[in-house]
């Protein structure tokens, strides 16, 4: 399965809010050219919460089409209703994804028993590899390593994206889940340490705009070269924090637009475009990361 530098891809939109498929194709080509190891389409950064299911599936399918087998595409299949997640999973199973990424059900705060039942039911609806996704800062539920370990025996649940930023969890997850279970960081700021401690990859927001540099850092960390990984990570650290000066993906879409990667930075309500007070902060962070701003 997929290791390394994985982009949590933005979903480009036109000024009227419709999907900008021409920009989406350019983004896919950009990541292939820059050496990104895989793409996650329509996850959190791809605005999954504001795409209706039919549009969600269409964007993932088009991403797969544009990739044309040159880079693996993982489709987001999370929902806070298990039946809806199963319906989405069945639809995504038909479009050629290499895997799926399922966030823990949000808002309704399931217990560990509920999380286990949810993920087992979703996994049973497909034979495509499933990656669990823990991001309590958004979902209001924190899936503990012990709960993840209960799902290791499900044949097509192959890993977890852990986005708490708690580095101690890497060791605990590895102890409980074994060496074959994939561990992916979902926190750019701690990704280097995560990989050096035995993680397999990073599903990254910053990777949208610094893919070559981010991959170089990931490759160094995966090779165990801590000194090189640190030297490559240091110029990017200001970017990691500034990309969260407002809710993700507001800043990264604005940055991608300023780079000329997408036609406009439109984002769907209830999110709004980046406030002016953040513009200078983000331009400064981009400049320090050696990103050309247009």
UniProtKB/Swiss-Prot annotation:
GO terms for cellular component: cytosol. The record marks 44, 107 as: Part of a proton relay during catalysis. Pyruvate binds at residues 45, 203. The keyword Zinc does not apply. It is found in: Cytoplasm. Pathway: Amino-acid biosynthesis; L-lysine biosynthesis via DAP pathway; (S)-tetrahydrodipicolinate from L-aspartate: step 3/4. It comes from the Bacteria. The active site is at residues 133, 161. Belongs to the DapA family. This is 4-hydroxy-tetrahydrodipicolinate synthase. The lineage of its organism: Bacteria, Pseudomonadati, Pseudomonadota, Gammaproteobacteria, Alteromonadales.
């Amino acid at each position: 399965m997929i290791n390394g530098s994985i982009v949590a891809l933005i979903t480009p939109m036109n000024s009227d809010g419709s999907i900008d498929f021409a920009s989406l194709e350019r983004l896919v080509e950009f990541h292939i050219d820059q050496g990104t190891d895989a793409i996650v389409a329509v996850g959190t950064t791809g605005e999954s919460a504001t795409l209706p299911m039919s549009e969600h599936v269409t964007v993932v399918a088009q991403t797969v089409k544009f990739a044309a087998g040159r880079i693996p595409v993982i489709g987001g299949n999370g929902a806070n209703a298990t039946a809806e997640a199963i319906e989405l999973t069945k639809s995504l199973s038909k479009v050629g994804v290499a895997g799926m990424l399922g966030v823990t059900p949000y808002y309704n705060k399931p217990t560990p028993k509920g999380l286990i039942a949810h993920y087992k039911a979703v996994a049973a609806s497909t034979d495509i590899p499933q990656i669990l996704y823990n991001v309590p800062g958004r979902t209001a539920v924190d899936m503990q390593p012990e709960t993840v370990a209960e799902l290791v025996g499900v044949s097509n649940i192959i890993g977890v994206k852990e986005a708490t930023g708690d580095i101690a969890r890497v060791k605990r997850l590895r102890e409980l889940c074994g060496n074959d279970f994939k561990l992916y960081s979902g926190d750019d700021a701690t990704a280097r340490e995560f990989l050096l401690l035995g993680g397999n990859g990073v599903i990254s927001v910053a990777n949208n705009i610094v893919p070559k540099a981010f991959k170089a850092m990931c490759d160094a960390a995966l090779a165990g070269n801590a000194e090189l990984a640190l030297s490559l990570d240091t110029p990017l650290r200001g970017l990691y924090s500034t990309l969260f000066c407002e809710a993700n993906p507001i800043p990264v879409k604005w940055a991608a637009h300023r780079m000329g990667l997408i036609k406009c930075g439109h984002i769907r309500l209830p999110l709004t475009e980046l406030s002016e007070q953040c513009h200078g902060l983000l331009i400064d962070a981009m400049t320090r990361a050696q990103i050309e701003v247009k």
